Amino acid sequence: IDTIADTSSAEAMGVIAALKKSDQTYAHCIDVAAIFQVVYKKIYGGNRDHNVFKDEKQMILASFLHDVGKAKLPSSILDCTEKFENDSREKLLIRKHPLYGAEMLSKMGMPGFMVNMAKYHHVKLDTSMYSSYPEDARYESASKETRLIAIIDIYQALVGRRSYKKSWAPPAAMRYIEQLAGIEYDFEISEYFQHMMGHFPKGSLVELSDGSQAFAISVPKTDLERPQVIIVRNAKGQYLENHTFLDLAVEKDLSISKGLDHYDIFGEASLEFFMNLQVS
């Protein structure tokens, strides 16, 4: 991100440095940008009539800076370990971050689509909802890029680690977004996101119908409920040294019964465990 911003402007470097004052916020922006880059390129990347970004670097920078307005908020708010009440002073300040971000990017001379992503990524289809802000914003003002990053923003907010809440398992977050498609989020773009990520995104820990536990390692092209998986714990509850590969699209006698929180099972070693799977 620093390298990309350095080729853009000194102002971009400055706001990124400001975001780094909160590890939680900075990590959120990094994760959102990483997901946005993959999903947007799959949907629009090959069509120059629909892809507004001049190159991949601009795409990453724009998606990273969607929350740039939080750079104006004090660390005591960004890293607070408690959830704020809706009528609290802190919550009112948080709700201003899209306007702060739009103003900052406009002053920096950033393209209009980047300003749009910062300003409207919290606007819902039903603007009467408390979770929709800025209050006077209309959903029609949100670009397709903004509508996509709104979905990715809430997905990462749910699955990411937060000091004031327990993170959601990725499958639960995907179900949440699916239920709100056409209510809070753009239905068509939500559908694209579902098909790109799958009901069980890569790396999701799941329990199979026989009681074994496995990591999802693919997004199926047809039945989103039946990804390829690698079993890490058998039906007897024993951890395996050599892990079994299964394609649930082929193994019809098995299915996924539920998603699991990998932090509950593996703690901070979850990613390392997943990256070092040994398939027999």
Set out the residue ranges of the language-model regions:
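Non-catalytic interface/linker regions that flank or bridge core catalytic/transmembrane domains
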Residues: 1-42, 54, 222, 231-237, ...
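Acidic/His-rich, divalent-metal-binding segments that scaffold phosphate/diphosphate chemistry
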Residues: 1-95, 105-109
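Histidine/acidic-rich helix-loop-helix segments that form or flank divalent-metal centers
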Residues: 59-63, 105-146, 165, 177-224
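Conserved beta-strand-loop-short alpha-helix elements that form
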Residues: 147-160
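Active-site-proximal, acidic helix/loop segment immediately C-terminal to a metal-coordinating Asp/Glu
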Residues: 159-173
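SH3/SH3-like beta-barrel fold
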Residues: 206, 227-232
